[in-house]
């Protein structure tokens, strides 16, 4: 139902797995994803082996959704960016733990209600934590990289203002 798409699955490695410990952070777990982007799928078919690839962002920063975001983040530290257009989702992949009873480890492009309906699990499972150090799980992961003020009545001239409220019913 969700593959290919913006979802990653945490699985237990087989004892004699050929997956590098560098990829798994010395864990016996691995996250697997089936991307939907046509360029990524073409690359995976051409190389004919699994590919380990992080998000194109510096740790603890917001994930890029366009080529320009990547260039802005890395500047001259990178030589090229594969142009595939802007992200259709704009968020990281949802990460599902499939070791034991399925549960959501990180919310992302697929909402929890849809996933929990699919795996027929209770929302209480979402609170269960798996002791895994994985990309995107840091409390700083979605930090914008600039100071933020909450519950501001009036913004300063050099600040943006985001209003969050319930939508009015039509």
Predicted region positions:
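Active-site-adjacent structural elements in enzyme catalytic cores
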Residues: 1-170
